[in-house]
Regions:
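Class I S-adenosyl-L-methionine-dependent methyltransferase catalytic core
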Residues: 1-258
Length: 258
């Protein structure tokens, strides 16, 4: 059964406090947030402050400082922020921390304040009313979030243009709901897959950027340092060296304007 989307963001779920401790037992203290001023972004934690944003342990969650920086730059208080691949709700939590209105959609809603909606068919009543859209879409069939056949992440990157065509529809919907002068941001990485002893590189970022340019004016391109634990695991690094391929050390953050 499909939840009915509406324009009243529901109350903020209670978020657990941070308990992260580095080796040695000393409590890790997250540094204060600040506006990133170069095109290389880095922050040593998934979350900021003393609490958590989104659901702890959710696979593929967006680092919350990225959304914080975007909303500080491109939105004002009371403006409407939408995330149509809302995942664990990180965008919703950050937006509410900053006194922005927020709506989250996903075909696999993980919280009650996220509505079960396909990003290719956003609610018609949103047309021209959204100030900012953030998306961190699934790609490459790396993660399985559920059985909904509308899940774009189930489209294989190696299977022609199906994934990119689906994302093109998403970009068209984002263009429809954004107000003139509104901004969107896409957070994504390229992909390298092993198939039957062979490797396949997929330039996901460039492919999606080319599609977005049909609808939007580019503002800037950011490289975001990845802090995935596997990047430091010896077996992963050894396999990359012996297999003559590269581990993904950064994500793209494409910022565009309607």
């Amino acid at each position: 059964m499909t939840d009915r989307p509406h324009h009243r963001p529901s109350g903020r779920p209670r978020r657990p406090s941070a308990k992260a401790r580095p080796p040695g037992g000393a409590r890790f203290v997250r540094p204060p947030l600040s506006i990133q001023v170069t095109t290389l972004w880095d922050y040593p934690s998934q979350d900021y402050g003393d609490g958590r944003q989104g659901i702890p342990g959710y696979k593929g969650a967006t680092p919350s400082y990225i959304i914080w920086n975007l909303l500080q730059r491109y939105t004002k208080e009371k403006e409407l922020v939408v995330d149509c691949f809302a995942g664990s709700g990180t965008t919703l939590d950050v937006a509410r921390d900053l006194n922005r209105k927020a709506l989250g959609y996903d075909v696999h809603p993980a919280r009650k304040d996220i509505f079960r909606v396909d990003a290719r068919k956003l609610p018609p009543e949103l047309t021209g009313k959204v100030d900012f859209v953030f998306i961190d879409p699934p790609y490459g069939t790396h993660l399985d979030y559920g059985d909904d056949p509308r899940d774009i992440g189930k489209l294989d990157l190696a299977d022609g243009t199906a994934y990119y065509d689906a994302m093109d529809q998403v970009f068209g919907e984002i263009h429809r709901v954004l107000r003139p002068g509104g901004h969107m941001a896409l957070y994504v990485s390229d992909s390298y897959e092993h198939r039957s002893g062979k490797g396949a590189f997929h330039a996901v970022g460039f492919e999606l950027f080319a599609r977005m340019r049909k609808y939007f004016e580019p503002v800037d391109i950011i490289s975001v340092t990845r802090h995935n634990k596997t990047l430091e695991m010896g077996n992963y690094r050894k396999a990359a060296e012996e297999g003559n391929y590269f581990l993904r050390g950064f994500n793209y953050l494409f910022i565009l304007r309607k």
